[in-house]
Amino acid sequence: MKKVLVVGSNGKEGSLIVNELVSRGYDVTGLGQSENKTNVKQYIQKSVFDLIKEEVAKYDVVVDALGAWTIETIPNIGNAIIYLGKLLSGTNTRLVVVGGAGSLFVNDEQTVTVDMGPDFPDDWKPLSSSHGKGLTFLKQTSNLNWTYISPACNFVSDGVRTGSYKLGFENLILNSQGESTISYADYAIAFVDEIDNNKYNKQRISVVSK
């Protein structure tokens, strides 16, 4: 049974990933700064930045599902990816990250990203930048097993769980309706499928509804 640590397990997406992992028989430990709000019995109440290498290296997979929505905490998104990446460098533990959509490319030359577009809200740019900082670090780190999973642009917290999705890579992809959208529930399925399969090591992938 694989052991998985889920950082940000109390969050909306983190808790769905926890549930999906538990349903598939993983040995799951949650981590957050507040009291445990999930259905896992193993829980670490502390900041991600207080973790040490010996703690995280004993897991097969570390999930980074940390959320942040205030201007003060948004930098923690990228900083947490970097911090965990440094802790896990040189180990066999995989780091799988709940990513952002803003850094997905929208042209074949891969020179223009979603967050460079005129319709991308200014309020979202700090969050996208923080995610991008973390992704850049991952791509530049050779001795780390990682996968960064970008959701669609429209990431629907209360969306329907359909059980189906479509995968892409560095470029923005659309569903059969020409939309970039996915529910939190379907994203969690795709996320844990990648933990199951370990198919896209050292890559960014993206996911959209069918």
Question: Which positions does each model-derived feature cover?
Answer:
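Substrate-positioning beta->alpha
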Residues: 130, 178-192, 203
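Glycine/proline-rich active-site loop of Rossmann-fold NAD(P)-dependent oxidoreductases
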Residues: 141-143, 156-164, 194-203
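A conserved pocket-lining segment of Rossmann-fold NAD(P)-dependent short-chain dehydrogenase/reductase
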Residues: 166-182
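NAD(P)H-binding glycine-rich loop region in Rossmannoid oxidoreductase-like domains
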Residues: 37-93
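N-terminal Rossmann NAD(P)H-binding glycine-rich loop of SDR-like oxidoreductase domains
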Residues: 4-24
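N-terminal Rossmann-fold cofactor-binding loop
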Residues: 31-35
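Glycine-/Pro-rich loop/turn segments that contact NAD(P) or position catalytic residues
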Residues: 72-160
